Amino acid sequence: SGTGEITHSVLAEWGLDVSAPVPSHEPTLTDRLLDYAHKLGIRVPCHLPSGSMPAEFWERFPDAKKLVMQWSEYAPYTQLHPSDPLYKRFMVDFVRHYRERYGSDHLYIAEFASESRILEGAENVQEARIQFVKAISEALSEADPDGTWVPSSWSFDLSADDPGNPWQANWTVEQVREYLDAATYPLIVWDTWSEEAAKYERTDYFYGHPWAFSVLHCFGGETYLLGNVKELIRRAHALGENPQEVGCVGFNVVPENSDYNSFYFELAARLQWNPRAVDLDEYVQKYCRLRYGPQYVAATEPVWRLLVETVYGEDSGTVKIIMDPLYWFRPDLRLLAGWPEDDERVIPMWRRRSEFIPKLRRAAELLLAAGNLVGENNMARRDLVDIARQWIAERFNQALIGARDAFLAGNGGELARLEPICLTLLDDQARLLASWPAYRLSRQVAQVRDEYPDPVKAVKLLHVWCNPVEGQESVPLRDYYRMDLDELVADYYKPRVAAYFALLRDKCAAGRTTVTDEEFDAVYAPVERAFVAAPLCPLPDDEDPTDVVQDLLEDNVE
């Protein structure tokens, strides 16, 4: 917290012509958050800056060593090289200023080139990594001898290196060991994505260095119902009765989005305290009791058993096995948005997920039938909306896959039959989302109204291009913040799906069953531009979500 503020304080002290922050007479949001966390007994890490410096720094220190970096396809940026003496000096002063301003919980997060490629300044990337570890160790030893460095394993991409990868140069397990062994300051490796990547297994529990099991679960746009709960419990139990024997000294949860899937996150929180004591059946029962009240346990347990069988089961999506609603992406002829190496596993999963549809419908019906629960409990209403939107999404996915298959088979009649089904499902989804305030695009716009000159465009750019600033576009990050919001579905996803069907229809009529990437881009790019340029067009929001779900169930008898 307060990274930019502290950086400017340090540079102003160094005599650079930067505006030092003006002390606030009232507690800032950062102050209030830290105070609240400390009242709960939570230690808050200090996130050290990467070393990126303003133009004034390079004018003052023209001979300072630098690294030119690039993240995805965005403009390259420059940061101070960790081997330059100014790097250590800056980090020491940063920690001093931070502790004077906010105090210290003696935990420090610092990463080197995470997700970024080095374009200039380091021919040997591993050598630069080791220089970073040594500089951080020396700086923290001087600035806070009682602290602990918390490096994240997210940087340790252990897949085969691909020079065309826009993110970073990958690692070998030997390089990870050399990196950690170079540290002369206490550390705890934060093994981000333990529940799936499990790098602690591939590195022999980080070669004796203390580490923490860290659940990632989702990126910023993965906001559908997902998370294999049995696998999470299995991995936590596999650490044994005494996880410290394999160096595991912590268990944390670090999602990019925590506003969804509370069932999964509550389970992860319970595993943090005593993994071996957690039993899934007992957890489901307790979750229902705490969420809805003891009088509704018998009525709601079957709802969550169905969800554990489906969206929270073995065919659940992950950050790597992407089972998202397919309308969140540009549809093509593959309809596979995850890692290509997983295609053979994912294709049969899509087929099996057709079995989710009647079970999700039944879950919604059971929740509606639970006395007056949905009427009196806002969390139950939220759960009803989430189950219903997942039911709609699964039906859409199967219909779109069927339409793709019909096109590849040259079956124009089946393609024509499925088109209105897909588009109607998106109308149903937009209507449902508009009935729940948290799922309205206008709500996001209202939250940032004072932050951007054109908040509508900023929010739309964020959802399309992962960046609220116009002109900052990166193809690998397109639709990163994909999610179910009413106008996003009605004014962006639906027109894109309509363009998909129009293109396939024309191709099919001409007797062709192939479409190039360039042809898809030609019909999708105008949809994206039109959505970003259009004003906000709020949908009717006067319906009760319970009524909407009941209508949709009645109108779609299976």
Regions found by a protein language model. Give the residues of each.
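Catalytic-core regions of glycoside hydrolase
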Residues: 1-297, 301-308, 313, 336, ...
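Long, charge-rich alpha-helical interaction segments
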Residues: 316, 320-336
